[in-house]
């Protein structure tokens, strides 16, 4: 369940957030400024404030399942993704895109063949950050999935602890579970460490 939720969220969020950030960074209009402000403002709203209304809505539309969890993660993650990608795209020279247009590329070709390769470090950075958030999150899966058969890894570890009772702790089961939980994050970080560091430090020093 954890892999399904994380992969679905990362694919959808990366596509929509990168496309939206590209439009915000390149289209100098009042509407784009307002849209950018709304994304930034959404980051300031604590989850606890909107927690109960969201769960109530999901229950009414019968989405207290993995699909509803993916939708919520995508909605919560897109604000930070747009914010980070907008700043990164602004550091990319616009002349590269204009040269592609002169060579006959349309707007979709410019986005997929020019922008996506250029912003790959930031895309990988956001995937790792959001992946860590989803992998370690407990509250949202607990509220959405509850006691359903499809549980995330954090919920499984929690229920392993609860099966031992109030004063029991099955350490022989908990320790291997926690180790298995952190190994994928370590492997992913080691594989994409170069891109992650490049994405985090982007824009820190002016050239």
Where are these regions (language model features)?
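A structural signal for multi-pass alpha-helical bundles of membrane permease subunits
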Residues: 1, 5-8, 12-207
């Amino acid at each position: 369940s954890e892999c399904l939720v994380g992969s679905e969220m990362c694919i959808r969020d990366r596509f929509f957030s990168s496309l939206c950030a590209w439009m915000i960074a390149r289209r100098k209009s009042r509407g784009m400024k307002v849209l950018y402000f709304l994304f930034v403002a959404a980051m300031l709203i604590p989850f606890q404030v909107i927690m109960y209304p969201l769960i109530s809505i999901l229950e009414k539309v019968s989405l207290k399942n993995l699909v509803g969890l993916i939708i919520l993660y995508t909605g919560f993650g897109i604000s930070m993704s747009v914010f980070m990608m907008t700043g990164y795209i602004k550091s990319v020279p616009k002349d590269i895109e204009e040269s592609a247009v002169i060579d006959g590329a349309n707007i979709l070709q410019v986005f997929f063949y020019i922008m996506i390769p250029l912003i790959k470090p930031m895309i990988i950075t956001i995937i790792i950050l959001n992946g860590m958030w989803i992998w370690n999150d407990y509250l949202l899966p607990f509220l959405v999935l509850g006691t359903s058969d499809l549980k995330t890894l954090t919920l499984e570890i929690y229920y392993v602890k609860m099966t031992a009772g109030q004063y029991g702790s099955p350490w022989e089961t908990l320790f291997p579970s926690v180790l298995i939980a952190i190994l994928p994050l370590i492997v992913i970080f080691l594989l994409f460490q170069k891109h992650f560091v490049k994405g985090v430090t982007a824009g820190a020093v002016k050239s």
